[in-house]
């Protein structure tokens, strides 16, 4: 079952990216390195509800 998630920047707490994931394959929270336009660099983004 795929669910929609929001990715939040760990440095500035900006919620920039929307994505989806399969809960059966990835039960824990997703962490990705993505570009943050507010910081103007690549930062760690964590999954939020």
UniProtKB/Swiss-Prot annotation:
Keywords: Ribonucleoprotein, Ribosomal protein. Disulfide bonds: none annotated. One of its GO terms (cellular component) is ribosome. Coiled coil: none annotated. InterPro entries: Ribosomal_bL33, Ribosomal_bL33_CS, Ribosomal_bL33_sf, Ribosomal_zn-bd. Signal peptide: none annotated. It holds the Pfam family Ribosomal_L33. GO terms for molecular function: structural constituent of ribosome. GO terms for biological process: translation. Belongs to the bacterial ribosomal protein bL33 family. This is Large ribosomal subunit protein bL33A.
């Amino acid at each position: 079952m795929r669910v929609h998630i929001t990715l939040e920047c760990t440095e500035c707490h900006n919620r920039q990216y929307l994505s989806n994931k399969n809960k059966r394959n990835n039960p824990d929270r997703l962490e990705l390195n993505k570009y943050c336009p507010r910081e103007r660099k690549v930062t760690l983004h964590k999954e939020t509800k």
